[in-house]
Every structure is written in C-alpha cells, then in structure tokens.
Curated annotation (Swiss-Prot):
Marked site: Interaction with DNA: K460, N463
Name of the protein described by the UniProt record: DNA gyrase subunit B
Subunit: Heterotetramer, composed of two GyrA and two GyrB chains. In the heterotetramer, GyrA contains the active site tyrosine that forms a transient covalent intermediate with DNA, while GyrB binds cofactors and catalyzes ATP hydrolysis.
Note: Few gyrases are as efficient as E.coli at forming negative supercoils. Not all organisms have 2 type II topoisomerases; in organisms with a single type II topoisomerase this enzyme also has to decatenate newly replicated chromosomes.
Name of one Pfam family that matches: DNA_gyraseB_C
NCBIfam families tied to this protein: gyrB, PRK05644.1, PRK14939.1
Top-level taxon of origin: Bacteria
GO molecular function, one term: ATP binding
Cofactor(s) needed: Mg(2+); Mn(2+); Ca(2+)
Keyword list, A-Z: ATP-binding, Cytoplasm, DNA-binding, Isomerase, Magnesium, Metal-binding, Nucleotide-binding, Topoisomerase
C-alpha cells in the first residue's frame, strides 16, 4: 500500500468537516469582488486557479500527487486530481450532500476545519462555489469509497442531487468541468501561456506533485508536464537560467511549531544588476510583497552587517552599503505556509499577517549568516558584489549632482533635440521617440504640434541589461530621454507625477534594425521606469514597411508578412486548386492550406542553411524526412520523391540525383559539368529540432501534395508539385497589376505619409506595452539582452516555429 493510500484510509475528512457560511447570489451580482476583473482576463483564469488550488491543498495535506488541467474543444475546462475526493455524505445541517454544499454555499469547505487542512490559500478566494456561480454549467465527478458520483449545475443551480453513476471503481479523486458564464466575462477564451505560467509556479512550489496541462482546442494538441523534485531551489535556477550565478544556491527551511508557520527560502546572487524576489503564501503569489518580504529584507541586511563586522571586511569598504545594495543581482523565492493568512485585499497581492515577520526575519538572519560562515569563499564573492554596488550607487549620486548643477545654469533643462508640444497637460500630451535626425525631421513636420512632441535619438543606445546604473547615467541618449520625460530615474528620485507625457511612444523603422533599437528602449523602460508600463503610458508605434498601389487605391502594410498575406489573398480570390482532377479548393479552404504552406516554407528557409532546400522539401512532403527513409519499405516512396526532384531540377549541365543508403546516413549525388555534387543527410540530422518541426507540419499537408495538383488563377493554369511552387506561383499572380514600394526607414516617408500612417490619432495603430507575468518578463529580457548565449539560442530555437518571415 502506497503512502497516499495509507493516508487516504486514515483520513477523517468527511461530511462533518464541512463548515458553512451562507450566501451565493452576491457572487453573480458583484463577481469582481470574488474572482477578480471580469473584463481583462484575470478573473477568467482565476476560475481555473480556484479549482486547481483545491487540488493543491490536497497535495499539501499529503493526499494527492497528480493534477490534470484540460482545455476542451467546446471552450470548457476540466480540472482533476487523485486526492481523497470531495465528501459525498449528507451534510447534517444542510440536509444535502456535502459535495452540493461545497458547490452551492459561499464559504463552505474543509478550509474552515483545521483537522481537514492545516494550511490553504486563505479565505479571500472563497472557493469553488464561486466558479460554480460564474459558470453557465458545471459538472462535478467524485471517486470515493470505490464509487463514482456525479452532480450537474446550471448557472450555479443544482439540476439534480448527487447520484451514484458507477460502483466498484478502483479510483479516488475529484474532477470539475465548467464552462464560464458568457454573461459575466467579456471574453471566455483561455490563454494557454497564462495558465502554463501559474501551473509551472505551483509545480515548483509543491515538489513531487505532477501537473499536466493539455490543450485540445486546436488541431495540434498541446501538452505540457510540470514535475520538479528540486522544489524552490530548482525554481531559482529556472528563473536565473539566463544569468551567471555567483555561488551555489542558499536554501533555508524553518518550522515554527507554536504558530504552525513554516518557511522555505532559496536564493543566490547573479552577475546582473537587478533584484528578482518572488513571495508566496500557501502557494499564492504576493506581487506587492508584505510582511514576509519586509522581514526577508531586514533579515538579509542584518546578515551582511553582522558578517562584515565579524570578519573585519567593513574596514575595507569605501562606501557604506544600503539595503538595496545587498539585493543587487539577487534572485530569491520565498514561500511561507501560514494556517490563517491575512491579506490586504481579495486579490491576495500583499500579506499583512504580522505574526509572520519575526519568524521569517529570525530564520533568514540565523540560517543565512550560518551559511556565510560555512562558505567563506562564496561569502567573499557576495560581499565584493555588494561593495561594488555601493560604489556604483555613490558614483551615480555624484553624476546626478553634476547634472543638477549644470541644469541650474541653463535657461531650460529640456534637451535641445526635443521638439516639444504646446500642451502642458500630460494627459493629452504624446512623446514620440524616433531613431535618427532624418526620421525626426519628417516627424516634426508631420506631427500635430499641439499635443505631439518629437525626440530624435542619435547614435548607439546603451543596453542597460549589461550596464551599471552609473554607466547608464553617462549615456547621452539615455540622459536625453530621462530629461525629456521629467520623472527622474531610480527609486530615490523617480516621480510619476512629474511625467510630462501620458503617451510615450517608441517609433522605430519597421525593419530588423528598428526592432533592435525598440528592444533596447523597452529594456530601459522595463528595468528603470517600470511604473510607466504598469500605468499603461508606454506604447509602440506601427509604421508601415510597404505601400502597395492598385489602380487609384493605396494601402500601407506593416511588414513583410502583411505584404505576403495581401498578395496571397489577392490571388486566392480568383484561384482554384484541383486535386487529382476531382476535389477543388477555393476561398476559405485554399486560404487555410496557404497558411500552412507559408509556415512550411519559412521552416524550409531556416533549415536550408544546414541542408539542401529542394531535397528537404521533397522528402518532407513524402513523409521521408525521418528515420523511415532508412527502411526498405520506403524505397518506392524514395524513388517517387527522387523522380519529382529531378523533374524540378532538369538541366543540360547536370545529371539526375541518385541516392545511396548507409547505416547512419543517406548520400544524394549527381554530376554537374563532370564534377560530383554530394549532399550527405545524417541520421542525427533527422532528429534535429528543425527537421522534426518540418516533418510534423508536412504531415498536415501530406494528403494534398500526394495528389496531382493544378492551379487556375484568372484562366491561367499551373502544374503544382511542391508547397514552394504553390506559394511562389500564388505570390507572382498576386503581384499582377500592383506596384510595391518599400520604405527603408521612416525618413523615406514624406510628412503627409507619416501623419496618415503613424501619427494621426484617428487612423494609427498603437500597441500598448503590458507585463502579464513579471518573472516571465524578467526571464525574457535576461535571455535576449544578457551575456549568456546558450539560453538565447534555446529561446530562438523554441520560437522559430512562430516566425514566418525573418527580416535579416
């Protein structure tokens, strides 16, 4: 008998464990109070978290080690676990099953009974009954006492009492399937990445619990497994995967038996200049920290002070350190378990339980100081980093003082390049940050000077991810930007009230250079002015890369992808693709095929740097870009593929391609003007990231390209053999009667064009910059802009499928 089964048999978790605090109608009247914002998606996803949290509470109690979350095709969600199963007996006070009580009564559940759960997420979430209240329908299945039970609800109202649907079932657990209310939520489409982030978080925090996330909504099923045995130490390493750690991880575990409060802490310093501290109470993230965070900070400062004094290193310090200096480059996950946690609001973003503070502070001080004394070499590296931070802070202070003295002597302290607007009200004022004087000149001519200011930045923009604060202040471009915004910079000086524009718009060219400059500016704002992002003041302009003209009509297109889409759609409207002289694809069906063909061709372009493009394509569409090519059963298909390849590449100077099979490689060869041309395909190449993805995508169009294809566009007929030929033919047909102009930069547009496409508030498109998950954003900026190469390579590989056209 397993540990979980023994606990299940011993459990006293029954109907009498359920305590009731009544009322459910209020949830439907004011859903935002109970589930979060019903308009921005946070409340919608919290519906899943409420059900998952119940399963995790079972795991915390030691009764569950598997949780499944499935996004179903019909838009519903299923959450299941292998815990004890919700109690099914009749509740003495209510006269209905305990399961129905839990689902229909507010504040009903085992969390109110200390014998059922020692710790849980607290009372502010108010439980799964809220999910029921805010669902069009909900279905609850319970496996308990070798019996399967079922109960259904419509808009929170019970259809029929809990019923037994199957007996003699060797299974335990709970399964909840719900469809969110279309009347309550503005949008009921779940975001896979948001759910993935939260479930990964929970898997790290609950070592040994396996969480499976499956998305069945699309043709290609997506499944991710989260299972970590390293706990929060593994979490810290995951968060810091794009940085160099200064030392091995410090791990602190502490239990206070009197209060029932326990602490798990993992942290290390890295070579960056930014702190990243994640705080959790009973698995729930506190974005605004609280008593556990303030306790950690004060405890850590005490540790550094004591260690410096004990070792005499304080005498070597040029400058006194601050609390911020001690946390420069720190990555920390702090998780506390509290029997009765108190939060500042229902969103649980800040812990206010005062009893947590002394326990956390004392544990941090005692255990971390002990670690320092046991690891003197690592401690010295940490102390050196803190002293460097203190010195840099002092240098930055002197640089700011010098800047202030200069500004006092100037008539105006606004930068000379800034073409300011006439409006003095920040709420209506806009600042466009543009690259170079050329684009700046055009923008100044085309703008509405009443409300639009233009700031051209000339020269190389500093990558602040790799620069200390004092070096950043020495950058002309960054200094100009800080002065123009008026807020100051860093925690001591920054004031959002002094911001001169409530729309700060990054406007760069629509090419790869513009993207790089935009990323550098986004890095600066994220690292040093995150308040602008949090308040929704930062935007990205969407200038066009192309202008297409057809007859008298003109259209501006944002990028290469938009141009290709336009040309393809132009041709598709008059196109028919016939398969084996029978089935015909037109309009939506042809458009769906072309979207796959475009993606397929993009992957081929990437892979062509490693192997011949034509051979790769012909093998892929014959399902041979895999280990099947080595099987004798595939010889006939390989011969057919070679015949197709040779018909495409006929040349009087070249012989046909031939093939030789070896144990771990395939050799393709032909003679060109007497010289042998060889292409070697290794078995290990077939197992590479690029080829696996090409092969997967090829299977989705296999049925089409295994037939004889004829394309007709406006009475013109074309024989089609491969996806590349289909795409190129469609694009060429789409170009007929159309002139295309490519803008190399914003400076190539005249002022009227720039106004019409990018500046005019009535016509333009702006992208507002938002941060959904801070630690995910932290990881992305560290990966893309940091010093470590390997995580960046992995990021590019894993996201290559999402790139259709790469402008290089």
């Amino acid at each position: 008998m397993s540990e979980f089964e023994e606990k299940l048999n011993e459990s006293s978790y029954g109907a009498d464990s359920i305590k009731v605090l009544k009322g459910l109608e209020a949830v439907r009247k004011r859903p935002g109070m109970y589930i979060g914002d019903v308009g921005d998606g946070s409340g919608l996803h919290h519906m899943i978290y409420e059900v998952v949290d119940n399963a995790i509470d079972e795991a915390l109690a030691g009764y569950c080690d598997l949780v499944r979350v499935v996004l179903n095709k019909n838009g519903s969600v299923t959450v299941s676990d292998n815990g004890r199963g919700i109690p099914v007996e009749i509740h003495e006070e209510e006269g209905i099953s305990a399961a129905e009580v839990i689902m229909t009564q507010l504040h009903a559940g085992g969390k109110f009974d200390q014998n059922s759960y020692k710790v849980s997420g607290g009372l502010h979430g108010v439980g799964v009954s809220v999910v029921n209240a805010l669902s069009d329908w909900l279905e609850l299945r319970i496996w308990r006492n070798n019996t399967e039970h079922l109960i259904r609800f419509n808009n929170g109202i019970t259809e029929a009492p809990l019923a037994v649907v199957k007996e003699n079932v060797d299974k335990k657990g709970t399964e909840v399937t719900f469809f969110p209310s279309v009347e309550t939520f503005t949008n009921i489409e779940f975001d896979f990445s948001i759910i993935e982030h939260r479930l990964r978080e929970l898997a790290f925090l609950n070592s040994g619990v396996k969480i499976l996330l499956t998305d069945n909504r699309f043709e290609e099923v997506k499944e991710v497994e989260f299972y970590y045995t390293g706990g929060i130490e593994a979490y810290v390493k995951y968060l810091d995967r794009a940085k160099h750690a200064v030392h091995s991880c410090i791990v602190v575990n502490a239990d206070n038996t009197e209060s029932g409060i326990s602490l798990e802490l993992a942290m290390h310093w890295n070579d960056s200049y930014h702190e990243n501290i994640l705080c959790f109470t009973n698995n729930i993230r506190q974005r605004d920290g609280g008593t556990h965070l303030s306790a950690f900070k004060s405890g850590l400062t005490r540790v550094i002070t004591a260690y410096l004094e004990n070792t005499g290193l304080n005498k070597k310090a040029k400058n006194a350190f601050s609390g911020e200096d001690t946390r420069e480059g720190i990555c920390c996950v702090l998780s506390v378990k509290v029997p009765d946690p108190k939060f500042s609001s229902q969103t649980k973003d800040k812990l206010v339980s005062s009893e947590v503070r002394p326990i956390v502070e004392n544990a941090v001080y005692t255990k971390v100081l002990e670690w320092f004394e046991e690891h003197p070499a690592d401690a010295k590296l940490i102390i050196n980093k803190i002293m460097e931070a203190a010195n840099a802070r002092e240098a930055a202070r002197k640089a700011r003082e010098l800047t202030r003295r200069k500004s006092v002597l100037e008539v105006s302290n606004l930068p000379g390049k800034l073409a300011d607007c006439h409006a003095k009200d920040p709420a209506v004022s806009e600042l466009f940050i543009v690259e170079g004087d050329s684009a700046g000149g055009t923008a100044k001519q085309g703008r509405d000077s009443k409300i639009q200011a233009i700031l051209p930045l000339r020269g190389k923009i500093l990558n602040v991810e790799r620069a200390r604060f004092d070096k950043m202040l020495g950058s002309d471009q960054i200094g100009t930007l800080i002065t123009a915004l008026g807020t100051g910079v860093d925690n001591r000086e920054f004031s959002l009230e002094k911001l001169r524009y409530h729309k700060v718009i990054i406007m760069t060219d629509a090419d790869v250079d513009g993207s790089h400059i935009r990323t550098l500016l986004l890095t600066f704002f994220y690292r040093h002015m995150p308040e602008l992002i949090n308040k929704g003041y930062l935007y990205i302009a969407q200038p066009p890369l192309y202008k297409v003209k057809k007859g008298a009509s003109e259209l501006y297109l944002k990028n290469e992808q938009a141009l290709q889409d336009y040309l393809v759609k132009s041709a598709i409207s008059d196109a028919t693709l016939t398969l084996d002289n029978k089935e015909q694809l037109t309009n939506e069906n042809l458009e769906e095929l072309m979207s796959k063909v475009i993606k397929f061709n993009s992957l081929l372009d990437h892979a062509s740097k490693k192997f011949n493009r034509s051979i790769t394509e012909i093998l892929a569409i014959n399902d041979l870009l895999n280990n099947k090519i080595f099987d004798n059963e595939s010889d006939s298909r390989l011969k057919k593929a070679l015949n197709a390849l040779n018909s495409l590449e006929q040349s009087p100077d070249k012989t046909d391609w031939e093939v030789l099979k070896h144990e771990n490689k395939i050799e393709f060869f032909r003679f060109s003007r007497g010289l042998k041309e060889r292409k070697i395909l290794l078995r290990e190449q077939l197992e590479s990231f690029e080829f696996i993805n090409i092969s997967k995508l090829a299977l989705t169009i296999f049925d089409v390209f295994n037939k004889q294809l004829k394309l007709v566009v406006k009475n013109q007929e074309f024989d089609i053999l491969t996806p590349s030929i289909l795409l190129n033919t469609i694009i060429e047909c789409g170009k007929k009667g159309i002139s295309v102009q490519r803008f190399k930069g914003l400076g190539e547009m005249n002022s009227d064009q720039l106004w019409d496409t990018t500046l005019d508030p009535k016509k333009r498109t702006l992208m507002q910059v938002r941060v959904a998950e801070v630690d995910e954003a932290e990881g992305i900026f560290s990966t893309l802009m940091g010093d470590v190469v390997e995580p960046r390579r992995q990021f590019i590989q894993s996201n290559a499928l999402n790139v259709v056209n790469l402008d290089v």
